[in-house]
Structure formats: structure tokens, C-alpha cells
């Protein structure tokens, strides 16, 4: 290809915002000549390369904006350490069909069993698929909502939690809330109901959410909306953080209490589809 034509292609690519093509046109032409590509194959190569770079850039930006503390994947999760957890069900969630139907995912279990890892892995997969994601702990979210309310910016702050396609709320139950704080959580869940997906992690069974939220009526109302279209994963295994300290590893109860039992909303909740 002549230098004049190469220069003109680079100028066109720059004006079209195709920065990768501008930088690699000579290399791509050489590859096409080596592989004896036809015209259509060469055009497909050019567009595929540019699209791949743009998608990679979009994915990195989405991860940066998500607030995820760790970029986990399901491939990193040790399912053999949690034998009661069905890998097939988790991988079914990773298809992200629950996001398409504005459903939720709740992960229940004691500290250290991998709830946040799984929530983060689903969130990373959602970012990669083009969904907007935001991660927060319940305590941090409530703190920001209270500060916003005190400064007359409550609706604006609440909207920031309504905007993402997927909102991950970590550590529900680690710190109790008062009734005013629980009401803020109710407003959030109510506004997102059937409009956007939530991924929740909690170390408390649903029966204990009344204590966590400081009000049984509010807890029931929140769970009613949260569980209407929800996949619940209960993890009852040992802690990953203690697995290398055998002397400290507690013995797992062979008959653990079902964390999904006990609340009226949990009893009446019906899954959208049978478990995988």
C-alpha cells in the first residue's frame, strides 16, 4: 500500500474516532497480504479489531466506575470447598438472565464463605456484558443517604443508586439500622423493584432481618419486594479465610439452620423458575 493511501486512511480513521485502526493499519494490511484475504475478510478484520479495542476500553471504564473492591471471577471460586453450593446454579446466574428480567440475587451465609466473591464475579460478568454496575456496602450506602438527607440532597443521592442496571449491596446485617435508616433502604428497594437488579449479600437469615432493620413490618415489606423475583443462594460451609489455619477452622454443623426460613416474605416467595 502506498504511503499516500496509508496516510489518507489514517486521517479518515482519526476523523471517525477509530484510533486503533489509525495506529495499526500498516500491520493489518501486512497480515491481510500474508493471509491472502479477500476484500470482505479484510473489512471484517478492520472492524473486528476496532470493536475489540473499544469493548475492552468500555469494560475497563465500567469496572472503574463500578466501585468493585475486587475484580473476581467464577473461575477463581473454589466450589470444592463449598460442596453444598451447586456450581451449575451459580453458572446459570452468570448467564445474566436475571438482569434481563430485572430479578435479584441474594447470597446468605456466615462470614468468609465466599458471598462477596460470588457477588463480585456476577458484577464483573455484568460489566463485561455491557450492563452498568455499582457496588456498595449497606453501611456505606446508608451513611451517604443520611448525609445527603441532612444537606437537602437525598433524592439526588438516592437516584445515584437507582441508575445502575445492577446494584450490589454487600454486608447486610453486619451493623443494625434504626427505623429511619431502614426506611431509606425500603425506599431504595421499592424504587428498584422490577426496574433494576440487586445482588445482596448477608450473614443473617431472613428471619433475622427484622432485628437488623429495626422494624419487622419494614423488613417484611423490603423482603416482599426483594424476593418476588429472586434467586437465593445459601452457603453453609466453612470460612475460606480459615481454611489454611486448620487449628482454627470450626466444625461445620451437619444440619445448619436454613437461612432462607423464618420470614413471612421468604415463606411466600415463589421463584420465577425451578432451580437448576
Q: Which positions does each model-derived feature cover?
A:
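Conserved P-loop
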Residues: 85-163, 212, 275
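Interdomain "pre-motor" coupling segment immediately N-terminal to P-loop NTPase/helicase cores
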Residues: 10, 14, 19-70
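Solvent-exposed alpha-helical segments within well-ordered globular domains of core cellular machineries
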Residues: 7, 11-14, 23-26, 44-45, ...
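AAA+ P-loop ATPase motor domain of ring mechanoenzymes
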Residues: 44-97, 101, 243-252
Amino acid at each position: 500500500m502506498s504511503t499516500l493511501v496509508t496516510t489518507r486512511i489514517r486521517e479518515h480513521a482519526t476523523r471517525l474516532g477509530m484510533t486503533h485502526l489509525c495506529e495499526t493499519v500498516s500491520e493489518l494490511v501486512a497480515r491481510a497480504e500474508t493471509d491472502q484475504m479477500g476484500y470482505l475478510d479484510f473489512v471484517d478484520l478492520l472492524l473486528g479489531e476496532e470493536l475489540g479495542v473499544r469493548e475492552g476500553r468500555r469494560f475497563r471504564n465500567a469496572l472503574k466506575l463500578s466501585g468493585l473492591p475486587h475484580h473476581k471471577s467464577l473461575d477463581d471460586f473454589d466450589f470444592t470447598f463449598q460442596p453444598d453450593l451447586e456450581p451449575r446454579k451459580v453458572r446459570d446466574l452468570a448467564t445474566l438472565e436475571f438482569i434481563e428480567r430485572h430479578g435479584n440475587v441474594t447470597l446468605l451465609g456466615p462470614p468468609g464463605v465466599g458471598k462477596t466473591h460470588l457477588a463480585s464475579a456476577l458484577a464483573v460478568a455484568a460489566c463485561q456484558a455491557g450492563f452498568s454496575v455499582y457496588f456498595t456496602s449497606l453501611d456505606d450506602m446508608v451513611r451517604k443517604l443520611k448525609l445527603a438527607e441532612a444537606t437537602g440532597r437525598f433524592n439526588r443521592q438516592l437516584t445515584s443508586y437507582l441508575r445502575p442496571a445492577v446494584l450490589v449491596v454487600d454486608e447486610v446485617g453486619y451493623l443494625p439500622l434504626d427505623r429511619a435508616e431502614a426506611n431509606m433502604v425500603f425506599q431504595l428497594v421499592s424504587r428498584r423493584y422490577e426496574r433494576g437488579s440487586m445482588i445482596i449479600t448477608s450473614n443473617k437469615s431472613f428471619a433475622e432481618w427484622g432485628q437488623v432493620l429495626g422494624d419487622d413490618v419494614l423488613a417484611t415489606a423490603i423482603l416482599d419486594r426483594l424476593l418476588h423475583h429472586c434467586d437465593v443462594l445459601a452457603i453453609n460451609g466453612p470460612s475460606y479465610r480459615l481454611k489454611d489455619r486448620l487449628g482454627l477452622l470450626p466444625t461445620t454443623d451437619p444440619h445448619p439452620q436454613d437461612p432462607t426460613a423464618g420470614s413471612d416474605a421468604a415463606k411466600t416467595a415463589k421463584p420465577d423458575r425451578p432451580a437448576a
